[in-house]
Amino acid sequence: MSLITELPAIFDSFSDARRQGFLAVMALKERQIPLVGTYCTFMPQEVAMAAGAVVVSLCSTSDETIEEAEKDLPRNLCPLIKSSYGFGKTDKCPYFYFSDLVVGETTCDGKKKMYEYMAEFKPVHVMQLPNRADDEASRTLWRSEIVRFKELLEQQFGNPISEQALREAIVLKNRERRALADFYRLGQLNPPALSGTDILKVVYGATFRFDKEQLISELQEMTRRIKAEYAEGKRLDARPRILITGCPIGGAADKVVRLIEEHGGWVVGYENCTGAKATEQCVNEEGDLFDALTDKYLAIGCSCISPNHQRMKLLSQMVEEYQADGVIDVILQACHTYAVESLAIKRHVRERHGIPYMAVETDYSSADKGQLATRLAAFIEML
């Protein structure tokens, strides 16, 4: 297939930051490197990397393009879905524009149907995720989906994926996971070494980086420097320690984190897809690689999996390791699985760990900032 290498017609109207994003990814494409876009942590990036492609997260956390998306999609739909579609439709996301393939997944009904419309203007491959993660039938299905994805990439880009290439990709991706985990585990320090806002900025921003070796090096150096400064006494004041769980956040949804920290708390950890859920577990580098990929990705504790034992397990681990004083469940409007699962999370946090829990529902607008501030301030004061 021919790769996309030219800038969109509306390039000149973009802000300088976004122009730089387009130019950076265009430089990559001029080297004839395929770009695979993704929205979800279930996408097995190692397979695309082994095919010689660069994998990048796509824009989906701003209300900038939601109005355009609502011309095609229902208004009462999850903002992440509308934002994803809107950025693709309007050519305002450099990473989507230059993607040669977008990989979706069946994590929710809204996404599944949205991908059908997205496929009208971009090649889209949807991976069929099982509803369970704890039985052999589900494992067999997901393994076959990973193999099917491999075969599609080989056909799409004309580059056979060898076992050696896949193993090397797994090793590299694991190194990235460990570097990210070492960085975000700085939140375990008490009192904190840095704010949750800064942690999120780095972890979320890492999903848009192309050069993994450079990213790993920068993360390791940043972690080393922060630990050294902490040992010398550079640290934040003691405040109530908050653990975030729930829907993916970043971009506009990071308003919740900022409000928590503006009203007397510190966000010390992220259990959600933006944080530990994606990186806490690595892929086994030995044995059958497709079995190893299957096991790693089915261990992601997403609310689309039922029953969702992995989320409870990771949440308990993080409550203890991060010495959390409270848990805040961030739910995007119209995200039914996370909204329904909030009762189970509330029971788990309160009964198992004996600490306060609160769920907040939000979207990508700023309209609810006042209401959120009031609720979050009251919760933190209670701690």
For the regions a protein language model found, what residue spans apply to each?
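Redox- and metal-dependent alpha/beta enzyme cores, enriched for Fe-S-associated oxidoreductases
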Residues: 30, 41, 47-61, 68-69, ...
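Glycine-rich, highly charged phosphate/nucleotide-binding loops
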Residues: 75-92, 303-317
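Peripheral docking tails and interdomain loops at the edges
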Residues: 3, 343-383
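An N-terminal, globular interaction/scaffold subdomain
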Residues: 35-89, 100, 107, 114
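A charged, amphipathic alpha-helical module
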Residues: 2-34, 147, 151-267, 271-279
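Acidic/His-rich segments in extracytoplasmic proteins that coordinate ligands and/or metal ions
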Residues: 85-155
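Proline-aspartate-enriched helix->loop->beta-strand connector
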Residues: 319, 323-328
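Glycine/threonine-rich flexible loop motifs
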Residues: 113, 335-341
